[in-house]
């Protein structure tokens, strides 16, 4: 054993045996092995000295001759077959060479079928005679070492060994008994490695990450076993290239937790035909199917070659076929096809484009369908006639070109072109008409104006009014002022004093939330409207009665309010605002002297009929008292307004009435709604405290 270890250190390949080295046997390698018998040298003492001087003399006289050493060049195949190809010339002192009596590969391969066979390999050291072949020396420069093949039994091996040895007995290094043929052992080991590889590395799709679980879809920290630096797991088609050296991964740690990428498939399932076909996104990958089938066949061959199972037991798996797809009855398919052809035949007269369709234009899916039907028809002889008829019907259907991808555009191409041309003509006509209309619009208006002037009707051109923002944003100071007015504190705190009216905190508090407005707020706001008209001439002149005016007229008559206007001529104003209080509801009446109309605004529209007659009687009495003439109401319009904003609760009537008066003072139609009431409440607080209205014309 020490002999083998010393020689193996000089070879880089661990699988080569120690007697296959290409170097000459040195003096250190001459040490006797434990199994080698000691041989006495014939030349000892004076005889040995004489032989030494004689060898030196002969070597000096024969300088032209060269002493050669033959070392065996050995080539090792993948299955460790040992073959002697040839020898090379080298000078050696002892002329002893390493040979072995293994038989060549073809003979040993043929011998693998014998069951009870015993092969004894004897590795000896012997003087070898060199047969010089000039022809081979010129071509290869090598000497051929001829070995006679012997039968495969211990006795034949011993006889061949005795024939080859000379007078001296060869040195037997060691003997090795091989109970099983070498090639069969290698195949059995390779198949065992493949099974180990299948158990350790299940076939997983390449697109699954090693750090994620496809079932839980939760992130899993990678372990050393799942490092991305490791090579990708090879497919089953490349398992035959792996040996025992690269099957096991020694870097793997058993304690490391492995992520469950996919459920492991047992090895026995690899032999099933159903598991060898995998569908990805409903598309069958034929290349993967072939690889799985080839891997399955390779594994079955390995099982048989290893001798673990008999070929008869495995034949049942090979001959097992997949279940046939359940198909509908052929009679039903024929009946449906005939009905479809009848429908298409009846519609062919209405669709002339189908007659001109080439029968060669069909969809690929239909071709594949017909071909699949043909394959099934060939496999099932009992239904061959039915499938032949079905194929004929399908060919007729395909010849019509119903499934053609180009049928639609070609069928409607002419109609599309006609509609496109018609559309282009209409667009061009519309463009010409619009251009002519824009050029002659002024002339036509002038002609109409002249014809109307001849009839006595004048048409005034419309004057574009300036757009006014009726809901402008409040200034920044308004929020602070409103917060101060509506916060807790002394309710008698005075905020403003104008128009002989004092506004305190308790008065401003009526504008918060859904509180009812009191008399001070309404009177003060109406005075702001009058003050704005006095300061700017573009506004109509406004006069406003206080909140007690209408109550006195109704309850006490004209005499109770006669002295209220002794210094004021209400007929000199353009608009007179009359706030109307109906007990628990506020309304607004507007008397427009310039436009001769009396309007009553009620946000609830409860059908009150007493307000308008009372105001008309007041105007008649006031005219007789101040002008000494009767009031002439011819041409006047007295009505209750209906198309006005309506309140949606029972607390905003005071705000509605004030805004009706403000919009009427500008002679504009009110456009606010219930949703604007919170805005108007804050705005009225700011306008009252600042004594200035924000709305303008």
UniProtKB/Swiss-Prot annotation:
Q: Where is this region: Protease?
A: 501-664
Query: Where is motif Nuclear localization signal found?
Result: 15-19, 462-467
Effect of loss of the gene: RNAi-mediated knockdown causes increased presence of smo-1 conjugates during the first embryonic mitotic division.
Q: One Pfam family this chain carries?
A: Peptidase_C48
Question: Which key words are in the record?
Answer: Hydrolase, Nucleus, Protease, Thiol protease
Mark out the compositionally biased spans (Basic and acidic residues). 1-14
What PROSITE patterns does UniProt report for this protein, alphabetically? ULP_PROTEASE
- Disordered, as annotated region: 1-47, 365-387
Record GO terms (molecular function): deSUMOylase activity
**Primary subcellular site in the record, as a coarse category:** nucleus
GO CC terms: nuclear envelope; nucleus
Top enzyme category: hydrolase
What is the annotated localization of this protein?
A: Nucleus envelope
Q: Where is the active site?
A: 585, 602, 653
Q: What is its EC number?
A: 3.4.22.-
Q: Which GO terms describe its biological process?
A: embryo development ending in birth or egg hatching; positive regulation of error-prone translesion synthesis; protein desumoylation; proteolysis; regulation of protein localization
The entry's family comment says: Belongs to the peptidase C48 family.
Chain's role: Protease that deconjugates smo-1 from targeted proteins and may catalyze the processing of smo-1 to its mature form.
Query: What PANTHER family has UniProt attached to this entry?
Result: GH15225P-RELATED, SENTRIN/SUMO-SPECIFIC PROTEASE
Q: What is this protein called?
A: Sentrin-specific protease
Name the source organism.
Caenorhabditis elegans
Upper classification of the organism: Eukaryota, Metazoa, Ecdysozoa, Nematoda, Chromadorea
């Amino acid at each position: 054993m020490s002999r083998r270890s010393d020689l193996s250190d000089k070879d880089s390949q661990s699988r080569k045996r120690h007697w296959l080295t290409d170097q000459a046997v040195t003096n250190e390698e001459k040490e006797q092995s434990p199994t080698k018998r000691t041989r006495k040298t014939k030349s000892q003492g004076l005889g040995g000295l004489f032989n030494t001087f004689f060898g030196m003399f002969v070597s000096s006289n024969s300088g032209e001759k060269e002493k050669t050493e033959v070392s065996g060049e050995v080539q090792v195949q993948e299955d460790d077959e040992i073959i002697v190809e040839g020898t090379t010339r080298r000078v050696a002192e002892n002329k002893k060479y390493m040979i072995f009596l293994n038989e060549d590969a073809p003979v040993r391969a043929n011998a693998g079928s014998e069951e009870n066979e015993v092969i004894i390999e004897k590795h000896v050291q012997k003087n070898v005679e060199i047969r010089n072949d000039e022809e081979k020396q010129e071509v290869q420069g090598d000497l051929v070492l001829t070995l006679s093949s012997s039968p495969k039994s211990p006795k034949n091996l011993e006889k061949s060994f005795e024939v080859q040895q000379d007078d001296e007995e060869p040195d037997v290094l060691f003997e090795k008994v091989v109970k099983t043929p070498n090639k069969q052992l290698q195949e059995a080991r390779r198949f065992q490695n493949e099974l180990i590889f299948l158990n350790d590395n299940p076939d997983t799709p390449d697109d699954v990450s090693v750090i994620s679980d496809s079932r839980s879809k939760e992130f899993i920290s990678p372990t050393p076993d799942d490092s991305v630096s490791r090579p990708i797991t090879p497919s089953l088609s490349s398992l035959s290239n792996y040996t025992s050296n690269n099957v096991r991964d020694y870097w793997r740690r058993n304690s490391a937790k492995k992520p469950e990428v996919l459920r492991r498939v047992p090895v026995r399932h690899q032999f099933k035909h159903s598991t060898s076909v995998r569908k990805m996104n409903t598309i069958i990958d034929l290349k993967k199917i072939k690889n799985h089938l080839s891997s399955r066949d390779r594994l079955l061959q390995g099982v048989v070659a290893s001798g673990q199972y008999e070929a008869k037991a495995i034949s049942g798996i090979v001959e097992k076929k997949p279940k046939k797809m359940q198909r509908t009855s052929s009679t039903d398919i024929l009946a449906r096809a005939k009905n479809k052809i009848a429908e298409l035949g009846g519609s062919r007269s209405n669709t002339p484009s189908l007659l001109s369709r080439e029968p060669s234009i069909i969809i690929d899916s239909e071709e594949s369908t017909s071909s699949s039907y043909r394959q099934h028809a060939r496999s099932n002889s009992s239904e061959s006639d039915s499938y032949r008829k079905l194929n004929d019907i399908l060919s007729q259907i395909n010849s019509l070109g119903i499934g053609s991808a180009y049928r639609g555009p070609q069928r409607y191409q002419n109609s599309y072109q006609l509609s496109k041309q018609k559309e282009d003509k209409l667009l061009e006509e519309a463009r010409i008409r619009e251009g002519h209309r824009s050029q002659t619009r002024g002339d036509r208006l002038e002609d109409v104006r002249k014809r109307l002037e001849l009839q006595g009707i004048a048409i005034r051109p419309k004057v574009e009014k300036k757009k006014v923002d009726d809901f402008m944003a409040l200034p920044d100071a308004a929020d602070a002022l409103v917060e101060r007015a509506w916060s807790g504190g002394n309710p008698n705190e005075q905020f403003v004093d104008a128009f002989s009216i004092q506004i305190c905190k308790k008065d401003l508090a009526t504008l918060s939330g859904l509180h009812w407005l009191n008399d001070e707020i309404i009177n003060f706001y109406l005075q702001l409207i009058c003050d704005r008209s006095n300061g700017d001439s573009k506004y109509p002149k406004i006069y406003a009665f206080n909140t007690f005016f209408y109550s006195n007229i109704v309850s006490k008559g004209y005499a109770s309010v006669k002295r209220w206007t002794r210094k004021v001529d209400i007929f000199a104003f353009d608009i007179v605002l009359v706030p109307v209080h109906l007990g628990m509801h506020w309304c607004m009446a507007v008397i427009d002297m310039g436009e001769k109309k009396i309007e009553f605004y009620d946000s609830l529209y409860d059908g009150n009929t007493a307000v308008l007659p009372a105001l008309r009687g007041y105007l008649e009495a006031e005219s007789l008292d101040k002008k000494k003439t009767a009031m002439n109401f011819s041409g006047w319009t007295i009505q209750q307004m209906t198309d006005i904003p309506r309140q949606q609760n029972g607390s905003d009537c005071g705000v509605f009435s004030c805004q009706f008066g403000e919009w009427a003072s500008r002679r504009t139609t009110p456009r606010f709604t219930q949703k604007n009431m919170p805005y108007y409440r804050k705005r009225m607080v700011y306008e009252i405290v600042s004594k200035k209205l924000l709305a303008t014309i």
